Amino acid sequence: MTTIGAQGFTLRTRFAELGITETFRRVAEIGYRSIEISALAMTPDNVAEIAAASTEHGVAVNATSAPLTAEDGHSLTQDAVGVAEAAVKLGSPFVRIGMFPPAAYENADTIRAAARQANAAAPVLAERGVTLCFHNHAIEFARVGGDRVLDIILDAAPLVQLELDVHWIHRGGLDPVRTLRHYGDRVALVHLKDYRLALPNAEAYEALRAGDPGPVREALFGVQFAEVGEGTLDMEAIVRTAVEIGAPHAFVEQDATYGVDEFDALALSYRHLVDLGFTDLLRH
């Protein structure tokens, strides 16, 4: 069964302000029983506290995050064993790459080189029961020499699975439901992130009256990240498709909440998912 949990990037400032244990408590209080760890340093102390908080509050860690390379050395190219062992300590069956380093996107050859590095790390994780995934943004749907960047990555990294982010799929010009079905059993994880168009707020119009048109123009031509059910995406169809293709885990993510408390945003997404009939996926 597919589970629906919370994505830690949404709570990155809360982890910093409140600490790991209290943040987990608040996530559990909303009703989530699953989380993906992101934007949180995987130091030994943090891993130990995450494990304890997961047990105490009944929120399973179903995915963690690791970069391809990192200055602190905790990366897939520098310490794949350490990345895998941290995931194992947390009971996490998946590790995901949020994005390749910017230099990797220079051309098809650099994209393939980064993908091959990820592919080389995948068996190290697999030996320890952990699956490596790659998370998309919109840029992975750009074409290089006629091929989509995402397809170049997948061809060069056959041992790496996908974490498909439906907001970025839509922003990249594709239909999320069709894209989920297209990649099918290559999809292990899904990010449930809605897509919102919003009129300029009062502050933007105050700036306009003061002679600064920038905020109004930005809003008129911009896109927002939205709570599930508060945007334009067909989230019911998206979740049903994730279940249909057998994706084990989905996570509610909102990169920015525009002044709304992050826990309130996650709670609103939770309520909408309940209203759509997905209580079992949230409580599993």
Model-predicted regions and their roles:
Residues M1-P93, Q161, R271-H284:
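N-terminal pre-domain/capping segments
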Residues R12-L18, S34-V47, P67-Q78, P102-E106, ...:
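Acidic-and-aromatic substrate-binding clefts and catalytic sites of carbohydrate-active enzymes
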Residues R25, A53, H57, D72-L162, ...:
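Active-site acidic/histidine proton-transfer and metal-coordination neighborhood
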Residues E36, A63-S65, R96, C133, ...:
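Conserved beta-strand positions in the central sheet of alpha/beta enzyme cores
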Residues L125-V228, T232:
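Acidic/histidine-rich catalytic cores of soluble enzymes
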Residues A202-E203, E253-Q254, L281-H284:
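Short, flexible loop/turn segments with low-complexity composition
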Residues A247-G277:
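C-terminal/domain-terminus segments
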